[in-house]
Every structure is written in C-alpha cells, then in structure tokens.
Amino acid sequence: MSSLLGGFLSATFNPLSGAPTAVEYLVVAGGGGGGFQNGGSGGGGGAGGLLTAAGFAVTAGSAITVTVGAGGAGKTSSANGSNGVDSVFSSITATGGGGGAGSGSAGSNGGSGGGGMGGGTNAAGTGTSGQGFAGGGGVNVGDYGGGGGGGAGSVGIPPIGPSGDATGGPGGAGFCSTINGQRVLYAGGGGGGSFISGRVGIAGPNAGNGGSSGIAGSNAVANYGGGGGGNGNTSASGSGGSGIVIIRYPASQSAPTATTGSPQILYNDGYQVYIWTSSGTITF
C-alpha cells in the first residue's frame, strides 16, 4: 500500500516471514503392473501407496531428499506384474503398489495390493495400513476373470457376473487431493483382465483398464500412481503409473534456497506449491 504524504510518496509492505518450519505433503508411490496369465486372465495392479498430512517439520539449511517412484512393468508372459517403486519425501516413504497376479501365485502385496488372477491361485495382495487397500480376488470357474487392484480409496473388486461369463474386476477407488489447488484423483487400482472378448475390468482413476481376448491391459497414466490393467487370454498386461511428490506452505514464507529435480512451482490459494515428477531435493 502507498500514500502521498507532504508531496512525498511513502510505501508500506509485508516482508516475507522467513523460512518455513513445517510443510504439507502428498507422497504417492509408483503403481504395480498388471499380471499376465497365458490363456487366462491376470489381476489388476495395485495402486502406489499414498501418504498426505500437514505440519511436517522441516529444518532450514538441510537438503531434503525427494524420490519419485517408477511404475511397475506389465508382462507379456506368465508372471505377476512388477511392484511399483517407493516414493520418498524426507522420512516419509510411500510403498510401491503390488503387482497383479499371474501364473500360479497370489497378487503381490504393496501400498495397495494386486488383484488375484482368474484360474489357479486366486488370492489378492494386501495393502499397507494407512496407504492403500487390498486387491480383489479372481475366480477359477469357466471363463474366469481377474480381480481389480486395490486403490488408495477402497479395495479392488472381484470379477463381476456369472463365473462362466465374468467381466474383470474393477480397480479400487483413488484418493482426491487438493494440495495443488485443484481436485485431483491419485492412486486408483488397475482393472482385472477377462478371458472373454470385450469384458475388461474398469480401472480406478488414472489407472489402467484390464485386457480381454485380443485387447491388451492398459498402462496407467504417469505421475498418478495407478495400477496397470491385468491381461486377458494372450494379450499383454499394462504397466503401473509413476508416482509424484507435492509439498506446499504459505506464500508469505521464504522461497527455498535451492531445489533440484526441476519441480513445477505454483502460487495459489495463499500457498507456494512444489511438484516433483522426477527425483530431486529441496533446501529451505
């Protein structure tokens, strides 16, 4: 604000209040890849673990590590999808999502668990407490379907419909965050595959739909931590999406003295926001 006093222009301003002592964070790990069962149906990949909270203490002058986890790979031969990779902010670690089940094994455990396969071993993987949910189990009767991967918002769902005519299970719901000033859904579970053409399991938000005969499981969208879609019959399974790390603190406080990893920087709703889609550091 400025004013004219006795012919002289005076000005007042609000200086920055110094380096932050605490920040709000969102840490999402990479999602798990969908499972592949040759001639059957794979489970959907579990979402990457998701952690978010305010009031996390930070210390000026010390570099804080930021790690953004990659998504787990889908498969083209009988195997579980690969687990996603952990994401890290300082001491906060979100666990990579579990791979969907493939030939002869249960869905893998992770931030959220991978879905069970159709045929053979039908158990789903478990999620990590406070980060995500379990996958849905598969079925082993007739034209079986794979279960959906777990998400940060709910468990994955088993295949839908009669056991001899099953649609792949839907992936678990994601988590809605507004840390970047918009409503964004992260960490949805991958859809389960189906042996029957066209009966794909629908994915959770920004995750990969399941495959079916002649249709490959879809890859999850990068930097949302979703699981990949399970395979159907002989089609490939989808890969999980990479994770993301976001922090914010009041815009009235000082900017960082250094960052690496090229974070996107936003200013909105009275906050400065830093978004990493690749690994780096931040120093206040």
Model-derived regions, located:
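Low-complexity, glycine/proline-biased repetitive segments and flexible coils/loops
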Residues: 2-13, 20-284
